Amino acid sequence: MFRTAAGAVAAVGLAGAMSGTAHADWGRRGRRIPRQQLSIQLYTLRNLFEADLEGTLEALADIGYRSVELAGTYGRSAAEFRRLLDRYHLRATSAHVSFDGEDVDTLIEDAKILGYRKAACAYANYSTLAEWRAFADRLDKAAAAFRRAGISYGYHNHDHEFRAVDGVRPIDVIAEHTSPRNVHLEYDLYWVVEGGADPVEEYYRRFGRVQQFHVKDRGEDGGWADVGTGTIDWASLFRRTWAGPMKQYIVEHDDPADPLDTAKVGYDYLVDLRF
């Protein structure tokens, strides 16, 4: 799973060796990520968008991106932002959209205007299992409304969902208290590792529900790294998780020094990657 010994040592809590389906070799080598499944989470470039929204969208298109995952519309209406995406030949294939306390019908109408058919709740955190269960109930209800409108709504993890609360992991509460028909999972692979879990084992634990990957690398110091420059063995991970539904592979870095360089490094690495 890791490309260096230091990376493996840093990930204390991961299983030393993957077993069962995690060891399976899914056929031929040499696959590549189809470009239509390659995207970037625009949160990575949030500081640039605040200074120059159009110029940054154009720069992403020049790198080669054709799909993006939204994280807000930076003061524009859904229609205005859609026109900007169209101008630079970009397509919103997914978005992070909070539902708690929001008018879900309005969120759905905006999604239809912007054109995406996958959305996810970006964050939740609670201290008790009762709160997590109540959240899962609200999530399922909102996701059912999205589903009826033709949009798949999911949950995006951080690390804390993989750490037990009173003996139960919140990620398991979310998965077991929502319907697979309503709620898919968007696994942020950096945070899965940071939470002490094995991404491949977690993928097969919820096989069929994981429909999006946040492709975020982990440096030897445990911090964020540009995709392909850190310790996660992406070729092995993607090869072992190839089975199942078509997935979106979404480049992300939470705090890049040079967001456009990060975007280019991630795009070039994933386009060239063979597994």
Across the structure, where does each feature detected by a protein language model lie?
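N-terminal export signals
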Residues: 1-22
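C-terminal segment of N-terminal export signals and the immediately downstream linker at the start
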Residues: 17-43, 47
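Acidic (Asp/Glu)-rich catalytic clusters
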Residues: 29-34, 57-62, 76-92, 103-116, ...
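Hydrophobic faces of well-ordered beta-strands that scaffold small-molecule active sites
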Residues: 36-41, 68-70, 92-97, 119-121, ...
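Acidic-and-aromatic substrate-binding clefts and catalytic sites of carbohydrate-active enzymes
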Residues: 46-51, 69-80, 96-104, 125-133, ...
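Active-site acidic/histidine proton-transfer and metal-coordination neighborhood
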Residues: 74, 95-185
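Acidic/histidine-rich catalytic cores of soluble enzymes
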Residues: 149-231
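C-terminal helical cap(s) of enzyme catalytic domains, especially alpha/beta-barrels
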Residues: 260-275
